[in-house]
Amino acid sequence: MTRSLKKNPFIAKHLLRKIAMLNTTWEKEIIVTWSRTSTIIPTMIGHTIAVHNGKEHFPIYITDRMVGHKLGEFSSTLNFRGHAKNDNRSRR
């Protein structure tokens, strides 16, 4: 279900504060965050944000095509290793 248009997009306050500070000083550094639910807004374009995937922080460079999506969409949490090659033991 999508978010109501009456509400503003959710962005973590600490993340918004860090991006605003970097935009005023024109610095580019990696921002580390655990907030996968934050929505990408136009002020984030050009920054690299390291999003936590449950094990490590995965760096993501924000482009204009990502605006409106969530940060968690770009760092997958599951690692599919494939099905078993020889499944004879489970058939017994």
Swiss-Prot record:
GO MF term set: rRNA binding; structural constituent of ribosome
Q: State the UniProt keywords alphabetically.
A: Chloroplast, Plastid, Ribonucleoprotein, Ribosomal protein, RNA-binding, rRNA-binding
Asked if the record carries the keyword rRNA-binding, the reply is: yes
Q: Which InterPro entries match?
A: Ribosomal_uS19, Ribosomal_uS19_bac-type, Ribosomal_uS19_CS, Ribosomal_uS19_SF
One GO cellular component from the entry?
chloroplast
The subcellular location is:
Plastid, Chloroplast
Q: Which Pfam families match?
A: Ribosomal_S19 (PF00203)
Described purpose of this protein according to its UniProt entry: Protein S19 forms a complex with S13 that binds strongly to the 16S ribosomal RNA.
Recorded family membership: Belongs to the universal ribosomal protein uS19 family.
- Protein name per UniProt: Small ribosomal subunit protein uS19c
